[in-house]
């Protein structure tokens, strides 16, 4: 099944995508991870992406579409994967429909105040890039990774100032996707304000229903 996870930053779609990719053996394609890989490798594209992200802006469609399309073309099983962070707007959605058929959409619903709390509490390991949250997914030892004992840090775009810009961009560009997919009966809403285990359970129920139809 080809799944697209929609939702604002901080809705938990990335965390759930990683969990389900392990349980269902789906390939997890995260635009955020793809961008970070380019940044870490200091590619020309990575340098451009880094500047855009640090300014709290969304990466342009031309770059995003190319990165995602290239990645999809490299995976072995193109029938079972999760797209996390793509598409972000109508133009990207149209391009995705051109590339793939029978896409199912999961829309993560969550209150904006809770989003800010989640994102401002997010911490990432400098060594292994595992993601934690001081509010919802704390480490056993403060600011130390549970997996590799690396040092945790807060991304520049997770500060409250950058978050305001990111949420404004989301409301402007990504929210219209809800109507786009709802009109074609592909939208499946899920309450993302609950804890990870509950969200995962509810999502598995939705996936089961989709498979039966």
Curated annotation (Swiss-Prot):
Q: Which residues bind ATP?
A: 10-15, 122, 131-132, 194
Q: Please state where this protein is localized.
A: Cytoplasm
Question: For the region LID, what residue ranges are annotated?
Answer: 121-158
Catalytic activity reported: AMP + ATP = 2 ADP
Q: Does the keyword Cytoplasm apply?
A: yes
The biological process GO terms on file are: AMP salvage
Involved pathway(s): Purine metabolism; AMP biosynthesis via salvage pathway; AMP from ADP: step 1/1
* Keyword annotations from UniProtKB, A to Z: ATP-binding, Cytoplasm, Kinase, Metal-binding, Nucleotide biosynthesis, Nucleotide-binding, Transferase, Zinc
Residues involved in AMP binding: 31, 36, 57-59, 85-88, 92, 155, 166
Molecular function (GO) terms for this protein are: adenylate kinase activity; ATP binding; zinc ion binding
Q: Which InterPro entries does the UniProt entry name for this protein?
A: Adenyl_kin_sub, Adenylat/UMP-CMP_kin, Adenylat_kinase_CS, Adenylate_kinase_lid-dom, P-loop_NTPase
Name the enzyme group at the top EC level.
transferase
Q: How does the annotation summarize its subunit structure?
A: Monomer.
The free-text domain remark for this protein reads: Consists of three domains, a large central CORE domain and two small peripheral domains, NMPbind and LID, which undergo movements during catalysis. The LID domain closes over the site of phosphoryl transfer upon ATP binding. Assembling and dissambling the active center during each catalytic cycle provides an effective means to prevent ATP hydrolysis. Some bacteria have evolved a zinc-coordinating structure that stabilizes the LID domain.
Main function: Catalyzes the reversible transfer of the terminal phosphate group between ATP and AMP. Plays an important role in cellular energy homeostasis and in adenine nucleotide metabolism.
What is the name of the protein in this document?
A: Adenylate kinase
The record lists the organism as Borrelia duttonii (strain Ly)
Q: Which gene encodes it?
A: adk
